[in-house]
Design a protein with these regions (language model features):
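Hydrophobic transmembrane alpha-helices and their helix-loop junctions in integral membrane proteins
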Residues: 1-149
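Cytoplasmic/organellar membrane-interface segments at the starts of transmembrane helices
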Residues: 91-94, 146-234, 239-266
Length: 266
């Protein structure tokens, strides 16, 4: 858990200092992996589901970001943020796709990144409250460096070197379309994926609970059964019959007390 939180904060802080767009995406990937580690080692249903879902989200969002950065480098032959400006005016479709992917990476509600990070934070809050609070600052830092990079690259006046920036081709769109579709789908309706992983998550939590001293708050424990008034009254009735002067009453009470024992032996 500690290493996961360190990865979240370290990746986010270093990403805010990057002037290279590809390196910025790479360090944001470190922060995403920190959320995955935090969710898994929280050992709660929400944490494990969030960690596994965030693993899928990481492949979709970060993979799409690396593809888009590669397309920028192919067109401009540079990764320096300072050399990229005003691309939204010359390639609006490219900017729109980049916007969706970037917002999913920072965890905007309605996209896949929000569901995974929310489950991780909720699950880890149950067992590691202060670590979850510290990890939540990574979400704020992600919004800081990703929005800053987007503003520098796609807004502002178009440089002369960027006026010839080409729009997305149909081949590039065919590659990015499935990724964007899954990003939106998992953000709106993650239930099929969560239900699919639920049995494995439950078995893992039970295994950890049975073979270690860790007690997961996700495991429901049966409450102790209280003795009923009828069960408490039977010994008292036997004692009263034993104290009675009538031998018949004593024999009847003794037979009634021994009947359950004989039935259990059979």
């Amino acid at each position: 858990v500690t290493l996961g939180v360190i990865g979240i904060i370290y990746g986010a802080v270093v990403a805010t200092m990057q002037k290279d767009l590809k390196r910025l995406v790479a360090y944001s990937s470190v922060a995403h992996l920190g959320f995955i580690v935090l969710g898994i080692f929280a050992i709660t249903t929400q944490g494990l589901q969030g960690g596994l879902l965030q693993n899928i989200n990481h492949g979709l969002s970060t993979g799409a970001l690396f593809l888009l950065v590669g397309m920028i480098v192919e067109r401009r032959h540079t990764r320096e943020i300072a050399h990229l400006r005003g691309l939204q005016k010359v390639a609006p479709l490219f900017a729109a796709v980049f916007t969706v992917v970037m917002l999913s990476s920072l965890g905007l509600p309605g996209l896949n990144g929000f569901v995974g990070e929310f489950l991780v934070l909720v699950g880890s809050f149950l067992t590691r409250r202060w670590w979850a609070i510290v990890a939540a600052t990574g979400v704020i830092l992600a919004a800081l460096y990703l929005l800053w990079a987007y503003q520098r690259v796609f807004h502002g006046q178009v440089d002369d070197d960027n006026k010839g920036f080409a729009e997305l081709t149909w081949r590039e769109g065919a590659v990015l379309a499935p990724l964007v579709a899954l990003i939106v789908f998992l953000g709106v309706y993650p239930k099929p994926v969560l239900e699919r992983m639920q049995p494995a998550v439950d078995r893992l939590i039970e295994h950890v609970d049975e073979n270690s001293d860790f007690v997961s708050p996700s495991v429901e424990r049966p409450e102790p059964v209280e003795q009923t008034e009828t069960e408490e009254a039977e010994p008292a009735a036997t004692d009263e019959a034993a104290d009675s002067d009538d031998p018949g009453d004593a024999r009847a009470a003794t037979g009634a007390a021994s009947a359950p024992a004989e039935g259990g032996g059979e």
